[in-house]
Amino acid sequence: MKSTITFFIALIVAICFFNCDGRHRAQKSYTENLIKENLPSSFSEQVTFYPENYAEHVNDTTLTNGYRAHIKSYSDMVNHVVITEKKNKTILKTHYRKAIGEITVYKDNSEVFMTVINDQLFSKHIDNLPKDFNQYILKSLWVNQYKSLKNNQLIVDVLLQKPKSKHQINCQLIIDSKGKFNIIKNV
């Protein structure tokens, strides 16, 4: 009698083990299993930063009309524009880091102008910016040598672009020999 009870207990334990082998999950996709188990959404979210790490670019330009420009642009590691897309049930979040520019202008070896080129500078000096201007990032800035020599001023071209689109804002930062400046938005 004792061996019969032991046999039935062993049989019940064996049936339980064979029924808990995960076959019901093997027939479902990975995504269905994640949803059923209510696992964190971090498995279905991909976050990337562009650029991934700090980036810096320094450019010194000397012109024959006595102007010299020191331009430094670098990644803003705090402020960024987020573009969210959904692809194959995965949420893709791309963080485009904003860039900051610093420009120092010399005329005949004397410093005449220095400023930080960021969103606040354009917001202060340009009236007709798009409503979503905070979604634009500084793409590049460079000395326009031809116009600078022609007008005897330092003219810096600035390109701002909205990530993942063709929307751009082209501006010119015009600096005279006394350090007075003006920003013109090109149409």
Please give the residue ranges for each predicted region.
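N-terminal, helix-rich and Lys/Arg-enriched segments in bacterial and organellar proteins
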Residues: 2-6, 98, 103-105, 172-176, ...
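Extracytoplasmic electrostatic interaction patches
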Residues: 113-187
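A generic structural signal for short, solvent-exposed coil/turn residues
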Residues: 12, 61-63, 95-97, 148, ...
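Bacterial Sec-dependent N-terminal signal peptides
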Residues: 1-34
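Acidic, small-residue rich beta-repeat scaffolds with periodic aromatic anchors
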Residues: 21-31, 39-43, 47-66, 169-187
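Surface-exposed acidic loop/strand-edge motifs in secreted or periplasmic proteins
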Residues: 38-145
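Generic structural motif
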Residues: 4, 23, 74-76, 108, ...
